[in-house]
């Protein structure tokens, strides 16, 4: 009898815990994905803050030339970063217990791998939590689908690209200047500006910004006035009201006259689907482009593609970009090798031509 009562009590405690985890009445919804998200994101955030402030220099290239990234070692907010895991580690799983000492783990950039792995699990759990809350509330799942775009982008630069290049040292540093360094080196080695998927991503991000600004300004400009001219238009609305607060017909008519009739939407669902899908698909394509370039399927190369009847090269903008790429690649990892592969693998041009 006592054992039965204990089992019932335990089941009741577990049941109460499950109800609390999955309750939509909480101020912040937790959910089962939240059980995984909270500790992983807290770990990633805590280690990032400590490493950004106090981590010692990291031997990023694996050649015994440590690079400083933390504030306490001479950097500021702009130049500081969490330096990627050493090239000597490559793609090996490198938790603290795999190192001979904490100093060795820090020297080889262990915090970067710890942050990236926990961050990846955390953002995937956040996406699952969005779906879970939508499911509990009887909503459709498209919020999580939209969030999959930044998740795909982060996965591409922090995981897929290092895997394709063979080392976590090729991942994006966790800092402002480190991000720009990653972008410059990526252009030098992969010619990303000439990759169609990157072009689609640019169109998605800038187009999404434009459409968002246009939509917000049109809605704000076509509010249905519920007050007199002596009162604020905002006074006529209350949070959660069922009635629409703006006149889509008026907005459609304005925009149709501003450009042409079929340039605007007269259906609210079609409009908002377009506003969502445009930037999401753009970022999806960018993430896919990064993932293909990770395995050296690079952007288009039109170098020296225009020649005259005598075979002499007529330089185009592609040749200027190529020269800039070589210059950036020469500056990258200048102590790790004498020449970038592009320069070392071709014959020197004749000076008599």
Swiss-Prot record:
What Enzyme Commission number(s) does the record list for this chain?
1.10.3.9
Give residues annotated as binding pheophytin a. 126
Q: What is its main location?
A: plastid
What UniProt keywords are attached to this protein's entry? Acetylation, Calcium, Chlorophyll, Chloroplast, Chromophore, Electron transport, Herbicide resistance, Iron, Magnesium, Manganese, Membrane, Metal-binding, Oxidoreductase, Phosphoprotein, Photosynthesis, Photosystem II, Plastid, Thylakoid, Transmembrane, Transmembrane helix, Transport
Q: Which residues bind [CaMn4O5] cluster?
A: 170, 189, 332-333, 342, 344
Which Pfam families has this protein been placed in? Photo_RC
> Where on the chain is Phosphothreonine found, per UniProt?
2
Q: Which reaction does it catalyse?
A: 2 a plastoquinone + 4 hnu + 2 H2O = 2 a plastoquinol + O2
| Subcellular location per the Swiss-Prot or TrEMBL entry | Plastid, Chloroplast thylakoid membrane
Which residues carry the site feature described as Stabilizes free radical intermediate?
190
State where a quinone binds. Answer: 215, 264-265
Encoding gene, per UniProt annotation = psbA1
Would you tell me the Gene Ontology cellular component terms? Answer: chloroplast thylakoid membrane; photosystem II
Q: Where is this site: Tyrosine radical intermediate?
A: 161
- GO terms assigned for molecular function: chlorophyll binding; electron transporter, transferring electrons within the cyclic electron transport pathway of photosynthesis activity; iron ion binding; oxidoreductase activity, acting on diphenols and related substances as donors, oxygen as acceptor; oxygen evolving activity
- Residue sites binding chlorophyll a ChlzD1 per the record: 118
Protein name, please?
Photosystem II protein D1
